[in-house]
Regions:
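A short glycine-rich, Lys/Arg-flanked "PGG" loop and its adjoining helix->strand segment in the class I
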Residues: 136-148
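N-terminal, positively charged/glycine-rich alpha-helical extensions of SAM-dependent methyltransferases
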Residues: 1-23
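Class I SAM-dependent methyltransferase SAM/SAH-binding core
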Residues: 55, 64-111
Length: 235
């Protein structure tokens, strides 16, 4: 695993440098990352339906899909979607041992969505990078593509319920990144690079999107200040 020494110039991109350091970047930048990822994987396995498709919207390097497939095996099929060519290349290599069970597909979710029905959909730190005006349509598509009883596992960076809470969450989040070895300069460079690219919304707004799409049950399964994860079940 390459160490994250990425120094972004201009707007943030999921380029080859980011792809190489991505696992280290997540482990050091996402609070309780291992806990969140394990919970997401466990829920995907728990709710997977026999002989259905599992779709990862924003699969990055494909690691989580491979973890799920290592348990479910050929009882299911696996589709990873991303828009970054370096990420797609890494995901194809990661998922190659699955052979025909897995596909990695280049799609821009702003204008193109997978037509296949599925049993489980993952969206892990993906919607936050998509302009807000497209998000409800994407969540609606995921709901409509799920089989009855199927689930969406949604993980997002979020805003606090008010400005004071957001400011407190961000301050403590940056303190965590310092503890994980990032410098103040690296934190500031990444913050500026992500402005207007990563656009979080409140937890309540995310939950409203899930309910408005028609999900019968929605619950939060993980939260750390300005990060949250939900399981949404189709009725």
């Amino acid at each position: 695993m390459a160490t994250d020494r990425v120094q972004p110039q201009g707007a943030w991109k999921f380029d080859a440098d980011v792809t190489r350091a991505f696992d280290d970047m997540l482990a050091r930048s996402i609070p309780q990352y291992d806990v969140m990822r394990r919970a997401t994987t466990d829920l995907a396995i728990r709710f997977a339906q026999y002989r259905t498709l599992i779709v990862d919207y924003g699969c990055s390097r494909g690691v989580q899909l491979l973890e799920i497939a290592s348990v479910l095996g050929d009882d299911n099929r696996y589709l990873g979607i991303d828009v970054s060519e370096p990420m797609l290349e890494a995901a194809r290599a990661e998922l190659a041992p699955l052979g025909a069970l897995a596909e990695v597909r280049a799609l821009d979710l702003r204008c193109d969505l997978p037509p296949e029905p599925c049993g489980v959909a993952l969206s892990v730190l993906t919607l936050q990078f998509i302009p807000i005006e497209h998000r409800q349509r994407i969540v609606q598509h995921i709901h409509d593509s799920l089989a009855p009883g199927g689930v969406l596992l949604l993980v997002e960076k979020v805003l606090g319920a008010n400005h004071a809470l957001s400011a407190a969450f961000v301050e403590l989040y940056y303190a965590m990144k310092l503890e994980h070895g990032y410098t103040n300069d690296a934190i500031e460079r990444k913050r500026l690079s992500l402005e207007g690219v990563l656009v979080p919304i409140t937890a309540a707004w995310n939950e409203d999107m899930l309910h408005d799409a028609g999900f019968a049950s929605v619950d939060c399964y993980w939260r750390w200040m300005n990060f949250a994860a939900w399981v949404a079940i189709k009725g």
